[in-house]
Amino acid sequence: MNINATILGQAIAFILFVAFCMKYVWPPLMAAIEKRQKEVADGLASAERAKKDLDLAQASATDQLKKAKDDAQVIIEQANKRRAQILDDAKAEAEQERNKIVTQAQAEIDAERKRAREELRKQVAMLAVAGAEKIIERSVDEAANSDIVDKLVAEL
């Protein structure tokens, strides 16, 4: 019976050990394991949220970069249009100024030509009168001379 009492004593000691472990050791171990499981789950969820946030941030950055490029392209196109408009305006203004200068120069040339013709007509008339006086060798009075010059100028 000795063996039976030993087994019974060991069984009682084992039951006491299991009860002690169930009461004092098992709850802190389970709490630590559950806490660690929760931390791991929270870490995984946080990593997933961070990945989603990163994807959203990358998509947003890509959209903003595309928008910035589009805006830059629009600004460049507007600048090119403005440059072309300024060049066209400058060309038109230069053309108008050239036409104005050419018109003024032409008017001055025409006026100078007219003045030179009048001067030449007067000189030709004076030479004709002087030649006529010498040929006729007589003196023509001033009124007749003026009348002859006027007729000669009108004919020229």
Curated annotation (Swiss-Prot):
It is a single-pass membrane protein. CDD domains: ATP-synt_Fo_b. GO terms for cellular component: plasma membrane; proton-transporting ATP synthase complex. Its main location: membrane. SUPFAM superfamilies: F1F0 ATP synthase subunit B, membrane domain. The keyword Glycoprotein does not apply. It comes from the Bacteria. It is found in: Cell inner membrane. InterPro entries: ATP_synth_B-like_membr_sf, ATP_synth_b/b'su_bac/chlpt, ATP_synth_F0_bsu_bac, ATP_synthase_B_chain. Signal peptide: none annotated. The chain crosses the membrane at residues 11-31. GO terms for molecular function: proton-transporting ATP synthase activity, rotational mechanism; proton-transporting ATPase activity, rotational mechanism. Keywords: ATP synthesis, Cell inner membrane, Cell membrane, CF(0), Hydrogen ion transport, Ion transport, Membrane, Transmembrane, Transmembrane helix, Transport. F(1)F(0) ATP synthase produces ATP from ADP in the presence of a proton or sodium gradient. F-type ATPases consist of two structural domains, F(1) containing the extramembraneous catalytic core and F(0) containing the membrane proton channel, linked together by a central stalk and a peripheral stalk. During catalysis, ATP synthesis in the catalytic domain of F(1) is coupled via a rotary mechanism of the central stalk subunits to proton translocation. Component of the F(0) channel, it forms part of the peripheral stalk, linking F(1) to F(0). Belongs to the ATPase B chain family. F-type ATPases have 2 components, F(1) - the catalytic core - and F(0) - the membrane proton channel. F(1) has five subunits: alpha(3), beta(3), gamma(1), delta(1), epsilon(1). F(0) has three main subunits: a(1), b(2) and c(10-14). The alpha and beta chains form an alternating ring which encloses part of the gamma chain. F(1) is attached to F(0) by a central stalk formed by the gamma and epsilon chains, while a peripheral stalk is formed by the delta and b chains. This is ATP synthase subunit b. It comes from Erwinia tasmaniensis (strain DSM 17950 / CFBP 7177 / CIP 109463 / NCPPB 4357 / Et1/99). The lineage of its organism: Bacteria, Pseudomonadati, Pseudomonadota, Gammaproteobacteria, Enterobacterales.
